[in-house]
């Protein structure tokens, strides 16, 4: 990575404004999944060890520029203190006199959590005045919130106009892993693209067709490709306005020598429920009042074989409606193939794919699970991320 990280700067005694991603799911004031807090620990611990005064900023939920009591970061600060095994202070605002006083009282190695930055309307507008207020608290800006790196907000990008700006360790790892995948991949390189809609994945498919050896398609978006081949798809998801694009992608793959894999059989159902009756049919045999909800067993075998013979696999989007047991086998099979593959580096692109490997208990078998769904998708589209562009070059 050609951006400076916290390893490249002197931190001792410095006030560090560190943007983290503590946007964790909460239920009745309790954190239900602390993955994102744990992901930030190496950076926070490094800053503490280096003798920095660690000022942490994050958003939580979508308060839309006003104070929402249940979206305060108080429970997050409390849990962080437990995980760090030290006292973590919490400010009830993200800038201004109270925050400044608390920062002024900090010693080297102290940790302070600021209030939810999205309580302020200027955050999502990338307001320069708010960015200046944040910057006034610190000597150095550290961005470790890869999950929010595709947003040009005051605390993720704007603040970098007023302070030296470097990446944290999590951000650095994300950029190294995803950057290597796109610029210098080990081959064969396979991308697995799933999820519901073609329109969400157009950019990533187009960009990856120039990079990969194999492209595997699954999930709801596959049926637009199936229809593009001239097959009937019953009640399956289809974006009729994307059929021509699907044809174009299949043609491009052929021209570029990319092996393009689509389902050969699918799991179909007449009803969307945990107890649904399902059938398995060939891709050209979906009855008019049934819909495809998962890839079939033959497809699973083919995909698993491609995965097994790949050196690098990037996976973005499930193969079916994995949240429901009858339609989860395809996604599970892809996860299992990645877990079992020897010598294959697996990159899980955040979002639903990450949720799926967690759900199936396979997370620890994956080489890298990205902490940013939208951010990793935009990165794989070849877009520049505002929260990265703003960092100082090495």
UniProtKB/Swiss-Prot annotation:
The protein's Enzyme Commission number: 2.7.2.3
Keyword annotations from UniProtKB, A to Z: ATP-binding, Cytoplasm, Glycolysis, Kinase, Nucleotide-binding, Phosphoprotein, Transferase
UniProt subcellular location: Cytoplasm
GO molecular function, one term: ADP binding
Protein name: Phosphoglycerate kinase
The family this protein is said to belong to: Belongs to the phosphoglycerate kinase family.
Protein residues bound to ATP: 201, 292, 323, 350-353
First-tier enzyme category under EC: transferase
Keyword Nucleotide-binding belongs to the record: yes
Binding site for substrate: 21-23, 36, 59-62, 118, 151
Pathway per the UniProt entry: Carbohydrate degradation; glycolysis; pyruvate from D-glyceraldehyde 3-phosphate: step 2/5
InterPro entries in the record: Phosphoglycerate_kinase, Phosphoglycerate_kinase_CS, Phosphoglycerate_kinase_N, Phosphoglycerate_kinase_sf
Cellular component aspect of the GO annotation: cytosol
GO annotation terms (biological process): gluconeogenesis; glycolytic process
Modified residues (Phosphoserine): 183
Top-level division of the source organism's lineage: Bacteria
Record note on quaternary structure: Monomer.
PTM annotation (Phosphothreonine): residues: 299
Catalytic activity: (2R)-3-phosphoglycerate + ATP = (2R)-3-phospho-glyceroyl phosphate + ADP
Nucleotide-binding listed as a keyword: yes
Major localization class: cytoplasm
């Amino acid at each position: 990575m050609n951006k400076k990280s916290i390893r490249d700067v002197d931190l001792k005694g410095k006030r560090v404004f560190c943007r983290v991603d503590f946007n964790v799911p909460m239920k009745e004031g309790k954190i239900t999944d602390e993955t994102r807090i744990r992901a930030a620990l190496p950076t926070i611990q490094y800053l503490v060890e280096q003798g920095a005064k660690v000022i942490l900023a994050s958003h939580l939920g979508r308060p839309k520029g006003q104070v929402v009591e249940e979206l305060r970061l108080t429970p997050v600060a409390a849990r962080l203190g437990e995980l760090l095994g030290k006292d973590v202070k919490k400010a009830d605002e993200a800038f201004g006199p109270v925050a400044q006083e608390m920062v002024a009282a900090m010693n080297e190695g102290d940790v302070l959590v600021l209030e939810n930055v999205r309580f302020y309307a200027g955050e999502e507008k990338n307001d320069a005045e708010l960015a200046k207020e944040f910057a006034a608290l610190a000597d150095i800006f550290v961005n470790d919130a890869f999950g929010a790196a595709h947003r040009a907000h005051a605390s993720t990008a704007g603040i970098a106009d007023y302070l030296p700006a470097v990446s944290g360790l999590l951000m650095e790892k994300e950029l190294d892993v995803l950057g290597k995948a796109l610029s210098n991949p080990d081959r064969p390189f396979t991308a697995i693209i799933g999820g519901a809609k073609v329109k969400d994945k157009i950019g990533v498919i187009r960009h990856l067709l120039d990079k990969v050896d194999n492209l595997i398609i699954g999930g709801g978006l596959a049926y637009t490709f199936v229809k593009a081949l001239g097959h009937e798809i019953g009640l399956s998801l289809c974006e009729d306005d994307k059929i021509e694009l699907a044809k174009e992608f299949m043609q491009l793959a052929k021209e570029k020598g990319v092996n393009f894999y689509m389902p050969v059989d699918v799991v179909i159902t007449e009803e969307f429920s945990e107890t649904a009756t399902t059938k398995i049919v060939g891709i050209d045999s979906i009855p008019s009042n049934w819909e495809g909800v998962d890839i079939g067993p033959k497809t699973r075998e083919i995909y698993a074989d491609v995965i097994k013979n790949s050196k690098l696999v990037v996976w973005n989007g499930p193969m079916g409606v994995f949240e429901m047991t009858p339609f989860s086998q395809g996604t599970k099979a892809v996860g299992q193939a990645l877990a079992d593959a020897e010598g294959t580096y697996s990159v899980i692109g955040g979002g639903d794919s990450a949720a799926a490997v967690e759900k199936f208990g396979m997370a620890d078998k994956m080489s890298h699970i990205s902490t940013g769904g939208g951010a990793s998708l935009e990165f794989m589209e070849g877009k520049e991320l505002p929260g990265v562009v703003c960092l100082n070059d090495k």
